[in-house]
Amino acid sequence: MQKVHEELERILPKAIALAEDIFKNPELGYKEFRSREKVEEALKDAEIPFTEVAYTGLMATLDSGKEGPCIGLIAEFDAVPVLGHPYASSDQNAAHACGHYAQTGVMLAVFLALKEAGVMERLTGKVKLFFTPAEEFCDMDYRRNLIREGKVSHSSGKQEMISLGLFDECAVLLSCHSMGLIDTDYQAEVGASLNGFCQKKVTFLGTEAHAGANPHLGVNALHAMTLAISAINALRESFPEEDCIRVHYIVTEGGQTVNSVPSRIKMEMYIRGKTVEAIRSTERKVDRALRGAALAINCDLEIQNTPGYFPLEQDSALTELVRSQILRYMPESRIAEGTHGTASGDM
């Protein structure tokens, strides 16, 4: 173990430099071509073979050559759209506001340290490193096009890797994630759970008419959408606190011209919850609100559902093992345990 720590200290500056480079050059999911290239350069320098998988993903293996369990290390490296972020890309406002660049540096450093310390000579089994693309559930039209073109089969990178069977050999998967904790003394968190979610693409279809001369001849799809939002907001008091429900949305198309009654309005939304049943129960309420609003305004309605991520529950034995190692670096008072986050992830 001491040799691994020594190698980590030696590798750390290069790993941090790589992570900072990726931070300053963010790419959205299934577009991480440059980020992958930087990781590949680091693996080549260490003489570790790798395989490109899942469109923009990457996989590498340290093999002891002896029968034994396989441990997987997972790192994400996609960014998320953040308008106004100081390091946002000029083309798509992509920024590493979720900290995936840090995962890249951390897991690469661990993998290289295991290799350089010669750990596999004293172990059985394998250690696999996965750079998984497209964790952030965004830029969905682009991803749907990739699916239509047959380049991927699923909207997220880990879903894609699961479908390809890339995790099948692994007995255990380890990952890490930066957390934007504010006003806290905690420096680490273990055993946290997360909400799951489903994604909806909603289209209200009305009838165009001149908004000044003949508005009575039109059917205003924008009114249907605003009515639906009001209905969803009125439902919020029916969401049980213990279900940790979140329903949030954006308008992706709000009309074609001010001079016309809006005939097509599009919105996307997430429904998040602590359990699958909580998500399904809330989804039924939201769908009823959407249908009721469309019916009230006499609009047609289209709802396209995309499976998101399951709620996250971590393995208790593995969590305790990780916690015991964190205690080597900080006191117990700095470790948060068993919290629930209402965000989501695809681990």
Q: PLM ranges: what are they?
A:
Residues 1-97, 101-128, 133:
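Acidic/His- and Gly-rich active-site-bordering loop/insert found
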Residues 10-13, 30, 34, 38, ...:
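Conserved active-site and cofactor/substrate-binding residues in soluble primary-metabolism enzymes
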Residues 22, 161, 269:
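Residue-level signal for inorganic ion chemistry
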Residues 27, 76-78, 134-136, 179, ...:
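Active-site beta-loop-alpha junctions enriched in small/polar residues
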Residues 45, 226-347:
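Metal-dependent amide/peptide-bond hydrolase catalytic core
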Residues 77, 178-180, 206, 253, ...:
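Glycine-rich beta-alpha junction loops
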Residues 85-95, 101, 117-248, 255-260, ...:
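Histidine/acidic-residue-rich, glycine-tolerant segments that coordinate divalent metal ions
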